């Protein structure tokens, strides 16, 4: 009898963990559907609304073909099954996108908050009437509703290359997928100096994409964030040695080691902080509707700041907290306007904090303007300096711990100093799904490649850079 009771107890104890695991699996599957729906809503809203802002057109079918295929598991298998509605205001502008994912919950909502900050995904469970389609959108200064993107680009004059040349052949190879199996190039653009012609720009686009078509920059946004921080440093509002010192850290006084984390540590991906997912996966923030404060700020340190490299979205978001007061007076849209980047939008979480680890939409030409700023050592074509004199050197110089692999890391930028056949001073902004802005100071060249590469594929940016440089005149 005793033996039988013990056996029954053992079976019961074994069953409880199995039941708990089964319940957890069901919760995880439901959460994955909610995240996939948020991803779909935000991509549809961002791609279409930001294109229309620029005077371009993206259809839902185009977004489903490009942005919504080849994404990371498990969302890739879910997204195509989720129905959606695009709700427009009487003006014709997108109000929000609703994606249905569960019979007992409201659809996931991505709401369009206007031309200055674009679309934000709302929290899971937010009611659809949170985004009122009758409420008119604000209009950014100098921007007309519906027919947008008329602002001037960089004031530096540049000519379009016309005759077919060696660079066209490199572009054609990229569009044909020759720089990585399965890669999908949407745009290539090179800006360079030609003797007797000045600044020349040459570009090529996949069908359905063009000069005014924005795409999500993904982690190229990290380099844009580092540039914003440079502008704050130049204005005297911060130094990279400043501790970030969030209020809820300083409340703990000397007992909280996170008070030692500086802007420099965060820009160099060396805060020493832990997170429970790979550093490039912050799905709860990006697609779950959580906020930066909720998801990115409170992780503990596992290593002394400045001693270990760990690529992390959270570190870029932390670095921006170091200039949060400055950003409240000088938001990204004003900074982009100063650079002539009229077709670039930095989006926010629902509290208005900029998700500049990833959530920026921009065109290839605007990103070339961004790269040109570094070739000009932080000076605008008007002659106004907006970055410190040593900022280009700062962001492109390795310091402290470095990543393993083919590329080094500076401060918010990747370094191509390990890439054979590429000038050692080359540095770059890299982003998910094949976003690249390559800056080659010694050749006075900016190279932009946009793509929607599927997960698991890889565009060979070093080979592409070598081929582009070989195709250009050496003056």
Please state what every model-predicted region is:
Residues 235-271, 298-301, 325-362:
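Active-site helix/loop module of the DD-peptidase/beta-lactamase fold
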Residues 45, 226, 315-325, 358-380, ...:
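Active-site-proximal alpha-helical segments within enzyme catalytic domains
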Residues 93-184, 191-194:
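Non-catalytic propeptide/linker segments at domain boundaries
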Residues 250-282, 286-307, 311-317, 362-365:
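Conserved catalytic neighborhood of penicillin-recognizing serine enzymes
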Residues 22-25, 58, 114-115, 123-139, ...:
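Structured C-terminal helix/loop/strand segments within mature extracytoplasmic catalytic/sensor domains
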Residues 166-209, 437-438, 444-448:
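A short, well-structured edge-of-sheet supersecondary motif
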Residues 196, 215-241, 266, 319-323, ...:
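Active-site SXXK
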Residues 344-345, 392-446:
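Active-site Gly/Thr loop motif
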